């Protein structure tokens, strides 16, 4: 079973259209994890480009920990707080290329990998892996990289 949650009803509606086109059976819920009272816990949580948008990151991560089964895996992809990420993700993607609406990102909410690792470790997550993600705009593809200066993903396991 697959469940997708999002705070934005618009995002849920778009996701439902994508799932329908691909004939996928996904249960979507318009809710934030902090408000999800789930009896069944999840084996895997994918936080992909989410944490840089939440108001209370500590509460959000605590909620994810609570919703994850013991030894469950969480993937957290986000943006590093560097000058390079500011130039690429805000100036480039929002102002120059107009891939995203201006104001989508707040650079102050970007989080360095070591800061995110510290928060997750404090919650009793075990860090399994980290990798950089680089986007090639000419080929429209993402590649894994050792460079975590802009986009990166952390893989952690609930202890």
Residues of each region from the PLM?
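Acceptor-substrate binding/catalytic loop of class I
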Residues: 78, 95-115
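Short low-complexity, flexible loop/linker segments enriched in glycine and/or proline
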Residues: 18-21, 91-92, 142-146
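Conserved SAM-binding loop
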Residues: 1-86, 113-116, 154-158
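Short alpha-helix
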Residues: 107-130
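Short, flexible, mixed-charge acidic loops at enzyme active sites
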Residues: 85-95
């Amino acid at each position: 079973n697959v469940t997708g949650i999002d705070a934005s009803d618009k995002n849920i509606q778009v996701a439902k259209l994508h799932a329908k086109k691909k004939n996928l059976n996904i249960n979507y819920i318009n809710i934030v994890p902090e408000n999800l009272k789930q009896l069944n816990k999840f084996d895997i949580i994918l936080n992909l480009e989410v944490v840089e948008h939440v108001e209370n990151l500590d509460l959000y991560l605590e909620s994810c920990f609570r919703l994850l089964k013991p030894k469950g895996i969480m993937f957290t992809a986000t943006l590093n707080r560097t000058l390079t990420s500011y130039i690429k993700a805000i100036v480039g993607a929002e102002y120059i290329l107009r891939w995203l609406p201006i104001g989508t990102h707040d650079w102050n909410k970007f989080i360095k990998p070591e800061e995110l690792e510290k928060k997750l470790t404090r919650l009793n997550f075990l860090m399994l892996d980290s990798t950089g993600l680089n986007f090639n705009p000419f080929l429209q593809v993402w590649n894994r990289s050792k460079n975590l200066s802009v986009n990166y993903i952390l893989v952690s396991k609930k202890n």
